[in-house]
Regions:
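Rossmann-like NAD(P)H-binding beta-loop-alpha module
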Residues: 108-132
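A long amphipathic alpha-helix within ATP-dependent nucleotide-binding catalytic cores
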Residues: 202-256, 277-288
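Glycine-rich phosphate/pyrophosphate-binding beta-alpha loops
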Residues: 260-273
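Conserved N-proximal alpha/beta basic substrate-recognition cap immediately N-terminal to
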Residues: 11-113
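Accessory, usually C-terminal, subdomains that scaffold auxiliary metal cofactors
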Residues: 199-207, 222, 500-589
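Terminal, non-catalytic domain-edge segments
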Residues: 290-349, 353-356, 384-425, 457-460, ...
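Phosphate-binding site of ATP-dependent enzymes
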Residues: 144-234
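Eukaryote-skewed repeat-based solenoidal scaffolds used as protein-protein interaction platforms
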Residues: 368-529, 539-541, 548-556
């Protein structure tokens, strides 16, 4: 075996350690395993994976002090998470989640949670929080469902086996099980539904270790929600590896339960077709390689190819359709053929949404960025139209029209025309909505301009709107202006599927020059997504930007510590904290590959 690169430290020879050891031996990986109790002064490899979660507050403090000493010369998996105050404490986890409530999904609820030093303090908090019995008492540093007690009446708190200060208390949520979502290196490895066995004495516990029964969550809307929630939670805690537990109540509402930074995965592995040990050791190997050679744009491409099975379906389809359309390489199309049936099966449902404007008005009011809310209410059907048009477009441009071109026959032309004209007559809303509005106009042009010239787009009018003064606020104005212009160019290319008309290229050059000035005027606040999409558009129309090498340098310096993908490290973009995951940053990363690695198959013909 080669010189050891990875050290796995453990306390007990668990299923997880055995799985890691077996996978390392089969693949002849340079990994060594050692007992935590035998470690004295130094770590015998450049990368450390600490596999133990049995801690008290005192032992955690000692461990974290030792890890900090080692971190100067060793890459420690989950070190960023460990550095946060008391992150293993369940009460602290709920405090952190409460602090991040502004950018976590409103649909992921929190459970009323508190700690108490005395019995009187316990009763006061129960009253103040309006909690009814039963109440759940959990060891604040517990794991595997051990030591959890149900307090069915107020007097039960006097009979807990440990001191009150050792517990965290939560309102009891009647449930039909919970979900364990395993996040590895910025992506969700898999997710399972766990439910207490009816034969178990612990009918309130869903943990597999306490007799719970596990079932893999199938592809679908619920799985997409769980992936989105779990990756954002992992990002909040800056975790490379974690198990995110989400409770489902009897009505189907989802609640954040806890995060486990040393998750067991035997139950999940029994349901998953993918090896957790293989995935984790791949991430540890990448972490080692980053200590030797800085990752490159090619590293992004290799990473997303490798983790494709673990991306959300939305991210996976987005990545591989863009790579196929950009390069013409049929292997990218092949990679997502298995996803297409489920994706396209919703077209009829999307068309139904168009015929029910009231439901779309309601959803428009509650979704997306706040500054767009009024414009969405004025033009509520745009998102529903786009959902249909994009699926039909990619059916044609990626899969040669195998499925759903005929679905457009079900689109009411009068309603579409009135929606289109209303948007064109409202330049303020058009600019405010930016990306979805511009996409809608170009999709209408693509599908309907031949039969009805009123759908033909005039890019000079879009340029006038982009150059006009706006009052959205500095950050919102920048974001809207950049995406307004870049999506006009992407739309002109039929979303990467054809060359832009040579006659229109000079006008689009002017539009991109305006975008370049916008980015340059506020470079530190512009996101990597803004910048990479700008360079992609420059390649589409043959525009030579003075910012090319500046943006390339920023991309190369912006790799996450959790995997070979880039994130917003060197700018102040406000969404950074919730998107430091491979799934959340997929859009930016595929743009980076398109901008700086892959060649565009339609060479611009500049006139």
């Amino acid at each position: 075996m080669n010189e050891s690169r990875i050290f796995v430290a453990y306390r007990t020879d668990s299923f997880e350690i055995q799985a890691l050891r077996a996978d390392a031996e089969v693949r002849n990986l340079p990994v060594i395993f050692g007992k935590i109790d035998d470690m004295v002064d130094s770590i015998p490899a450049p990368v450390l994976f600490w596999r133990s979660g049995n801690f008290t507050a005192a032992t955690l403090l000692a461990r974290d002090r030792w890890l900090c000493q080692q971190s100067a010369r060793t890459t420690i998996i989950n070190f960023e998470a460990y550095r946060q105050t008391n992150v293993f404490s369940k009460s602290m986890q709920h405090a952190i989640m409460t602090a991040h409530v502004s950018f976590l999904p409103a649909a992921l609820k929190s459970i009323p949670t508190f700690t108490a030093e005395t019995i009187d303090n316990f009763h006061r908090k129960v009253t103040r929080l309006g909690i009814s019995f039963p109440v759940i008492a959990k060891p604040d540093y517990g794991a595997r469902g051990e030591g959890i007690v149900i307090l069915t009446q107020p007097a039960d708190v006097e009979h807990l086996p440990e001191a009150l200060s050792e517990y965290v208390f939560q309102a009891y949520v009647a449930n039909k099980g919970d979900y364990r979502v395993l996040v590895v290196g910025g992506v969700v490895h898999d997710c399972i539904h766990r439910q207490a066995s009816s034969a178990s004495n612990n009918a309130h516990l869903n943990n597999i270790s306490q007799g719970g029964v596990a079932e893999r969550v199938a592809e679908g809307a619920l799985r997409q929600r769980l992936i989105g929630y779990a990756t954002k939670v992992a990002s909040c805690f800056k975790a490379t590896l974690c198990g995110v537990d989400i409770l489902e109540d009897d009505a189907g509402a989802l609640y954040f339960l806890e995060v486990n930074f040393n998750p067991q995965w035997e139950g999940l592995q029994s349901c998953s077709p993918y090896s957790v040990a293989t995935h984790l050791l791949d991430e540890l190997t990448d972490a080692h390689d980053r200590t030797i050679t800085p990752p490159t744009i090619a590293s992004i491409h290799a990473y997303y190819q490798r983790v494709a099975p673990f991306l959300s379906q939305t991210a996976r389809i987005h990545y591989f359709t863009r790579m196929y359309l950009w390069t013409g390489d049929a292997s990218y199309r092949t990679a997502i053929e298995a996803d297409t049936e489920a994706w396209w099966s919703s077209v009829a449902r999307d068309i139904q949404k168009i015929s029910d404007p009231s439901s779309e008005t309601e959803s428009a009011a509650s979704a997306g960025k706040a500054y767009r809310a009024a414009a969405k209410l004025k033009h509520p059907l745009i998102a529903a139209y786009n959902a249909v048009f994009f699926k039909v477009l990619f059916d044609q441009t990626v899969f040669s029209g195998r499925h759903y071109r005929q679905e457009l026959d079900h689109i009411n032309r009068d309603l579409l025309r009135s929606t289109h004209q209303a948007l064109l007559s409202d330049p303020t809303s058009l600019f405010t909505l930016s990306t979805p509005a511009v996409n809608f106009l170009y999709l209408c042009d693509y599908f309907f301009a031949v039969e009805d010239p009123s759908f033909r787009i005039d890019p000079s009018k879009l340029l006038d709107i982009a150059q006009a003064e706006t009052v959205l606020g500095e950050d919102n104005d920048r974001d809207a202006r950049i995406y307004f212009c870049t999506h006009a160019i992407i739309g002109a290319s039929a979303f990467y599927s054809r060359p832009v008309s040579p006659d229109a290229i000079p006008l689009y050059h002017e539009m991109l020059a305006h975008t370049e000035r916008t980015i340059l005027a506020d470079y530190v606040h512009a996101s990597l997504d803004h910048k990479c999409e700008f360079i992609v558009c420059a390649k589409i129309i043959g525009y030579e930007s003075a910012l090319y090498h500046t943006i390339l340098h920023e991309v190369r310096a912006s790799f996450s510590t959790h995997g070979n993908y880039v994130t917003n490290v060197h700018n102040t973009y406000s969404n950074n904290v919730t998107h430091d995951t491979a799934d959340g940053m997929e859009h930016t990363n595929v743009l980076a590959v398109m901008a700086f690695l892959a060649d565009y198959r339609f060479v611009p013909r500049v006139k």
